[in-house]
Amino acid sequence: MDLISVLPSASKSCVCLHKPLSSSTHKLKPFCRKIRILGMPRPRKSVLMVSSMSISVNTLVSDDAVQRRTGGYHSNLWNDDVIQFLSTPYGELAYRERAERLIDEVRNIFSSMSLEDGESSDLIQRLWMVDNVERLGIDRHFKNEIKSALDYVYSYWSQKGIGCGTKSIITDLNSTALGFRILRLHGYPVSAEVFKHFRNQIGQFVSCHSETEEDIRSIVNLYRASLIAFPGEKVMEEAEIFSEKYLKETLQKIPDCSLSREIGDVLEHGWHTNLPRFEARNYMDVFGQDTKNMESNRKAEKLLELAKLEFNIFQSIQKTELESLLRWWNDSGSPQITFTRHRHVEYYTLASCIAFEPQHSGFRLGFAKACHIITVLDDMYDLFGTVEELKLFTAAIKRWDPSATDCLPQYMKGIYMMVYNTVNEMSAEAQKAQRRDTLNYARQAWEVYLDSYMQEAKWIATGYLPTFEEYLENGKVSSGHRVSALQPMLTMDIPFPPHILKEVDFPSNLNDLACAILRLRGDTRCYQEDRARGEETSCISCYMKDNPGATEEDALNHLNVMISGVIKELNWELLKPDSSVPISSKKINFDITRAFHYGYKYRDGYSVSSVETKSLVMRTLLEPVPL
């Protein structure tokens, strides 16, 4: 593969414009025409200002007066030495054998619960087990046991909820809220109307006067349940408002303990920005500090030991995968692309936090590679490339042939081959998993994606500000969500026949909503930095254009309301009962949305990856859990 030079060739070049794969209805014959490429010898001066909290804007001026913008992004935080010198003993056989014994012991705990049927707490005990194996990240070992436990709980579910046990005379909020959340997440048809029975005579949720740990925990579970609301569930909105306020006030009153840590984590990360492996790492600390659990409950000890072992064993797998990713990154010539962000380790970490089953190596590596390519293309189309060069590149991608590089500036040749080779390689991996060729399908997705970039590049070049609707429709494609998810998803051991794929990928509501969240949330976090780089077009600026007199604050408030509504719609698309598509088939696309949403929680965590994103890498990838 050609190494990449960021400096375009000064020679003339041509472009061969062929019929794109995605435009099958066009009858135009292929033709070639020569287009003059503005050369760019090595720039005289480059000024780089790096800040961990801000983005600087640089302009490179070539000898022939071509100006190219760069983002002034901070450099790669994870050099070769950091990756190559990672070491962990947890890949040894003894640790895996210990984990297997613990898995059997936990299965026995699940089995023993059937002997306690009819006991005063048989329902809450089952929910406790399911909730904790999921939060600790070890639920993949107990799918059958979880289903059996939830079938049992659901058989006693009523319009007023449930109590602690099957013989409970009255229902209670803690059991009902925890049960509602878990049952809904597993596709059981439970109605939010059940929470109306826990409001006072004037229809308001009321706090408990005693405020015991059990009372507080009930509100924690009510808050967790409220986050998986469907559109139109007014009672869930009220529950969220009440429980969030209650828990924030409670944090000011109670001492620092495992419960306060749990409340803080739940309020901080919720569900839509909480990544399963990251949640597991945080919950291990909470779970292990809960003296009530650890002193009187042998079950808790087994769960915690297994969770820690599994976490550390997976880090030995991550080390091997990171070495593979690093080889790809170097072989692709990526280190020589100096105008872009290098966040391949961060993207791999996100993938590892949502799909940490050992067999999903193809997904983790594919996601990291796809996201790196997307980042390079994003920076090339938004900042570095001229409009004429970008037209050449877009046309070359639609040819899908290495000879298309003959028509490209020198700095684009290696980028083209990185896209070409990686997409082909991921298609080969997908063919093994899905037993059919998906290359043409993937090519169509990449073509549409680059067309959306081309549209934005034209807007930037001409200073055109589109309407909000026009911008959002294009922006959902240019967000990159679809191309980041599609091929990595197809490498998994989850069947995606065509009728399922169309309900998960384009043109499904699930895909549309996921792309919308990424575009809307991304713009609320990036618009100021983008504007400083000369990119005026964003959801904020387009909304203000459509609504004369509206301020940035008005626009942000409107977008946040939109995001809240889209999240509820996304919940419905994932969890709606009686769907023809299993939740397991939709979950990975949904979790990718959570991963991107996490990256934009506080800032643009991909441009500025030296704060929260760096902490995520350290906590889930580099640092083992003390046993």
Swiss-Prot record:
Positions bound to Mg(2+) 2: D378, D382
Residues the record lists as binding Mg(2+) 1: D378, D382
GO CC annotation terms, alphabetical: chloroplast
Statement: the UniProt record of this protein carries the keyword Plastid: yes
Catalytic activity: (2E)-geranyl diphosphate = (1S,5S)-beta-pinene + diphosphate; (2E)-geranyl diphosphate = (1S,5S)-alpha-pinene + diphosphate
Required cofactor names: Mg(2+); Mn(2+)
GO terms under biological process: alpha-pinene metabolic process; diterpenoid biosynthetic process; green leaf volatile biosynthetic process; terpenoid biosynthetic process
InterPro entries in the record: Isoprenoid_synthase_dom_sf (IPR008949), Terpene_cyclase-like_1_C (IPR034741), Terpene_cyclase_plant_C1 (IPR044814), Terpene_synth_N (IPR001906), Terpene_synth_N_sf (IPR036965), Terpene_synthase-like (IPR050148), Terpene_synthase_metal-bd (IPR005630), Terpenoid_cyclase/PrenylTrfase (IPR008930)
Location in the cell: Plastid, Chloroplast
Record keywords: Chloroplast, Lyase, Magnesium, Metal-binding, Plastid, Transit peptide
Cross-referenced Pfam families: Terpene_synth, Terpene_synth_C
The organelle targeting sequence, given as a residue range: 1-51
Residue numbers covered by motif DDXXD motif: 378-382
EC numbers: 4.2.3.120, 4.2.3.119
Gene Ontology molecular functions: magnesium ion binding; pinene synthase activity; terpene synthase activity
Free-text remark on how the cofactor is bound: Binds 3 Mg(2+) or Mn(2+) ions per subunit.
CDD domains: Terpene_cyclase_plant_C1 (cd00684)
Positions annotated to bind Mg(2+) 3: D530
Pathway: Terpene metabolism; oleoresin biosynthesis; Secondary metabolite biosynthesis; terpenoid biosynthesis
Family named by the database record: Belongs to the terpene synthase family. Tpsd subfamily.
Entry note about domains: The Asp-Asp-Xaa-Xaa-Asp/Glu (DDXXD/E) motif is important for the catalytic activity, presumably through binding to Mg(2+).
Function: Monoterpene synthase (TPS) involved in the biosynthesis of monoterpene natural products included in conifer oleoresin secretions and volatile emissions; these compounds contribute to biotic and abiotic stress defense against herbivores and pathogens. Catalyzes the conversion of (2E)-geranyl diphosphate (GPP) to (-)-beta-pinene and, to a lower extent, to (-)-alpha-pinene.
Protein name: (-)-beta-pinene synthase 2, chloroplastic
Organism of this sequence: Pinus banksiana
Annotated gene: TPS-(-)Bpin2
